[in-house]
Regions:
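Conserved NTP-binding catalytic cores of kinases and kinase-like/nucleotidyltransferase enzymes
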Residues: 1-80
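ATP-binding pocket architecture of kinase catalytic cores
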Residues: 46-141
Length: 152
């Protein structure tokens, strides 16, 4: 779905003026006219992740709150991707093929977990505990878990 022209518009919104080297589709799913896409964008200086959700079925406010929560975790030393802002918001809109989509852009922080071990589960539990404490101490509530749960 994302071609070089759309990626240039997205990067421009987030004030990134770099040569686009490669666009890789990590995930695309369209079910019941609802769309979710995740793309890796490699520029001359960065590896970025761009998430695309249709506006019709996914709340911009929900995506913004999830992004705010992720950045709160980031500022509290929980390993999560740093998100980029456009006009003081993490989520922006872009018209693609006569339809509006919610767009977020973040740093690429590495591959997903490939090997599961007991040590990894211990570390995961510790991180969940820290996340809960940060959320409780900041009285931060999103109201919903994951945007992807809407499409599955």
């Amino acid at each position: 779905m994302l071609n070089k022209s759309y990626v240039e518009k997205i990067l421009s919104k987030y004030n990134i003026d770099e040569e686009i080297k490669k666009i890789i589709c990590i995930q695309e799913q369209c079910k019941d006219n609802r769309y979710v896409g995740v793309f890796e964008i490699i520029t001359s200086k960065h590896k970025l992740i761009c998430k695309v959700n249709d506006c019709k079925n996914n709340s911009t406010n929900l995506i913004e709150k999830q992004s705010q929560f992720a950045m709160m975790l980031y500022r509290n030393n929980i390993v999560t991707a740093k998100k980029y802002k456009h006009n003081n918001y993490y989520c922006t809109k872009l018209k693609i093929e006569n339809r509006f989509y919610n767009i977020t852009l973040e740093e690429y922080i590495g591959k997903e977990v490939e090997n599961i071990s007991l040590d990894m589960f211990k570390e995961f539990g510790e991180i969940l505990g820290k996340m809960h404490t940060i959320s409780a101490n900041n009285k931060f509530k999103i109201g919903k878990s994951f945007i992807s749960s809407d499409i599955e």
